[in-house]
């Protein structure tokens, strides 16, 4: 039996709709609904693992051996299956190296493979930088449609890079009253590029404020989004005092920051998948947060310290499926942790792949006409 698969480069992905913000947000909503129904598989014996990561050594006696010689140096393989209308398997693979920036390359270079659920045969091999960026922005926005105040007008972006752009575009798509953006960045170049992006792509935003400090950026904001790249030392994470946070704010965290324990314990704490954080808690024993720098692992550390109970960590799927009420007042502060899962990449990748097939986009490549050894 012959097998071929579709190769989609970045231009093909754009032509097939990978940048459709509203479509991606809806795909994430459907994904998490399926997740809540247990119609998925992740890696690992308990089907709850983020993926498998290669960590590089600091030194080696072997010439040319890859080293951990800078921030964010790793390889990750992330397999998954997603059911429902998607009924597709696949894997995201990425290599991350901050030194890429000096070569004119993105920090991370990502690819997604989609596979037939029954045979394992490849269906598609696709450029995934935009795919991953879009789903990373769409997940917080999907959650914001349940967790943010309906009258939210001001959003803060701490870290105006690629993820900041996709997050803001997605927030705008689900929060019709947003009209003001407060931005805190590290370089004038990133601030200028982000401001230009807003003016060209997001006419709903009428006011842009460039802030000199995190405190200035988060004060009086209805939605606060951290999309920063952090270093390994927790003390280097941006610090946020609870006194700066407006009542009723939603703090969206696909990144890391430092909060006072008592403040976090007073907030409603929501995660994308509590089992994911439990798996990290088991793999990286307490304290987990310095090792896995996603705020949900800080929640599990607080649980370990007896400052919160396990039931204080709420799954977004329980809110989507109406097993939990979600926001119960306009005054409560909610912190949402986004760990990221390959089911999200498979969902959006599968959607774009099927669009590409319908539109005749991409290059069909043969695997074999007949397997040589079968």
Name what the model sees in each region:
Residues 147-154, 177-178, 246:
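Short helix-loop-beta connector
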Residues 10-18, 257-372:
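Adenosine-phosphate binding glycine-rich loop
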Residues 228-232, 255-256, 274:
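Short glycine-/small-residue-rich Rossmann-like dinucleotide-binding loops
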Residues 174-201:
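NAD(P)-binding Rossmann-fold cofactor-contacting core
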Residues 206-221, 239-240:
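Short acidic low-complexity segments
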């Amino acid at each position: 039996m012959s097998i071929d698969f579709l190769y989609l480069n970045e231009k093909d992905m754009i032509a097939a709709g990978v940048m459709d913000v509203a479509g991606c947000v809806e795909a994430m909503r459907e994904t998490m609904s399926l997740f809540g129904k247990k119609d998925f598989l992740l890696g690992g014996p308990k089907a709850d693992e983020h993926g498998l990561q290669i960590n590089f050594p600091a030194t080696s006696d072997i010439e040319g051996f890859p080293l951990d010689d800078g921030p964010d140096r790793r390889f990750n393989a992330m397999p998954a299956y997603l059911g429902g209308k998607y009924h597709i398997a696949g894997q995201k693979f990425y290599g991350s190296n901050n030194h890429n920036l000096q070569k004119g390359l993105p920090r991370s270079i990502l690819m997604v493979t989609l596979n037939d659920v029954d045979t394992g045969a490849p269906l598609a091999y696709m450029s995934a930088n935009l795919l991953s960026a879009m789903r990373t922005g769409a997940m917080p926005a999907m959650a914001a449609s349940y967790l943010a105040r309906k009258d939210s007008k001001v959003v803060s972006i701490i870290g105006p890079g690629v993820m900041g752009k996709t997050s803001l575009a997605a927030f705008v798509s689900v929060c019709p009253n947003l009209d003001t953006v407060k931005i805190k960045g590290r370089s004038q170049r990133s601030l200028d590029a982000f401001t230009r992006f807003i003016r060209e792509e997001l006419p709903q935003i009428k006011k842009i404020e460039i802030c000199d400090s995190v405190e200035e950026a988060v004060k009086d904001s209805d939605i606060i989004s951290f999309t920063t790249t952090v270093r390994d030392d927790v003390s280097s994470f941006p610090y946020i005092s609870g006194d700066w946070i407006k009542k009723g704010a939603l703090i969206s965290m696909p990144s890391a920051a430092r909060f006072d324990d008592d403040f976090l314990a007073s907030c409603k704490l929501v995660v994308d998948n509590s089992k994911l954080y439990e798996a990290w808690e088991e793999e990286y024993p307490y304290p987990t947060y310095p090792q896995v720098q996603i705020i949900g692992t800080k929640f599990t550390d607080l649980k370990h310290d007896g400052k919160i109970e396990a039931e204080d960590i709420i799954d977004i799927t329980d809110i989507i499926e109406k097993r939990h009420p979600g926001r119960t007042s306009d005054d409560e502060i909610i912190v949402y942790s986004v760990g990221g899962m390959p089911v999200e990449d498979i969902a959006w990748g599968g959607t774009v792949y099927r669009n590409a097939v319908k539109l005749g986009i991409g290059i069909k490549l043969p695997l074999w006409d007949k397997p040589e050894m079968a």
